[in-house]
């Protein structure tokens, strides 16, 4: 098994996390949130979704968010310091051994970055109370749909991005494989809920959302690792941004929420 690749994160990545909310970016989860429960958010980023969960579980509940990127946690602690039932911890999932167990564990857009998602699910399972529940939200990157097609430079960048991920042991279609992964790790009552992200001009800040691939291309990591020439990376950003302003109609990112119980 490959070790999980270190993915470079910066302030732009922090901004992406800060823009997320429960209502817009984990829209079906609210149906299983109840006052008084204890929730663990694995890979919480800055805690922007965690704080929305904390508001729903209320003062008798608690949300613990963990993330292995320190700048995310530091940012979230500052932004959400007034949310008294939210605790944000800088730690890797596999090093996290709390005394208490959780009623619900959630993890959004995280397992896509791991080469060992099954081990991560087993670790999460060990942190659940009896009859506890898990909810995993993640992408199928192999079925991204742009309308119309973006410039060839961005198509080439995206193809390279998927290869870079695959070579690192990441599953580009983990959204489709989550039900079987949960079954293999001993969960039952498994549900798969379509949660596709659709962005067009009727959606608030849709240009920013479609522009996520310019932000991804903003990282030089694939250049440094020999996957991409820097000129192509810069060309992809420039031409894609122009396409967003002049041609883009919509983008659909395939996303599933998968739930299971123990």
Residue ranges with predicted function:
Residues 3-5, 11, 191-249:
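C-terminal helical/coil "lid" or tail adjacent to the Rossmann-like core of SAM-dependent
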Residues 19-35, 52:
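Conserved alpha-helix/loop element of class I SAM-dependent methyltransferases that forms part
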Residues 34, 58, 114-115, 128-130:
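Helix-to-beta-strand junctions that scaffold the AdoMet/dcAdoMet cofactor pocket
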Residues 40-42, 46-95:
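Class I SAM-dependent methyltransferase SAM/SAH-binding core
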Residues 94-105:
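A short acidic, Gly/Pro-enriched loop at the edge of an enzyme's catalytic core
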Residues 103-117:
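A short SAM/SAH-binding and catalytic strip from SAM-dependent methyltransferases
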Residues 118-133:
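A short glycine-rich, Lys/Arg-flanked "PGG" loop and its adjoining helix->strand segment in the class I
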Residues 135-203:
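Conserved catalytic/acceptor-binding region of the Class I
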């Amino acid at each position: 098994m490959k070790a999980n690749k270190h993915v470079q994160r910066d302030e732009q990545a922090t901004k992406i996390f800060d823009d997320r909310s429960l209502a817009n970016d984990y829209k079906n989860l609210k149906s299983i949130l109840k006052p008084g429960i204890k929730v663990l958010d694995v890979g919480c980023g800055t805690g922007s979704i965690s704080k929305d969960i904390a508001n729903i579980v209320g003062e008798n509940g608690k949300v613990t968010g963990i993330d292995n990127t320190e700048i995310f946690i530091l940012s979230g602690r500052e932004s959400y310091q007034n949310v008294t039932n939210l605790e944000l911890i800088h730690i890797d999932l596999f090093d996290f051994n709390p005394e208490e167990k959780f009623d619900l564990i959630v993890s959004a857009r995280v397992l896509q970055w791991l080469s060992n998602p099954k081990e991560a699910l087993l670790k999460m399972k060990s942190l659940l109370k009896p009859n506890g529940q898990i909810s995993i939200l993640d992408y199928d990157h192999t079925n991204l749909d742009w309308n119309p097609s973006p410039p060839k430079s961005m198509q080439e960048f995206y193809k390279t991005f998927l290869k870079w991920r695959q070579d690192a042991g990441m599953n580009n279609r983990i959204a489709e494989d989550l039900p079987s992964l949960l079954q293999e790790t001993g969960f039952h009552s498994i549900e798969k809920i379509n949660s596709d992200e659709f962005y067009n001009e009727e959606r608030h800040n849709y240009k920013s959302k479609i522009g996520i691939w310019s932000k991804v291309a903003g990282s030089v990591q694939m250049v440094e690792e020999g996957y991409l020439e820097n000129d192509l990376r810069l060309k992809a950003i420039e031409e894609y941004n122009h396409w967003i302003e002049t041609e883009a109609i919509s983008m659909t990112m395939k996303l599933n929420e998968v739930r299971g119980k123990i």
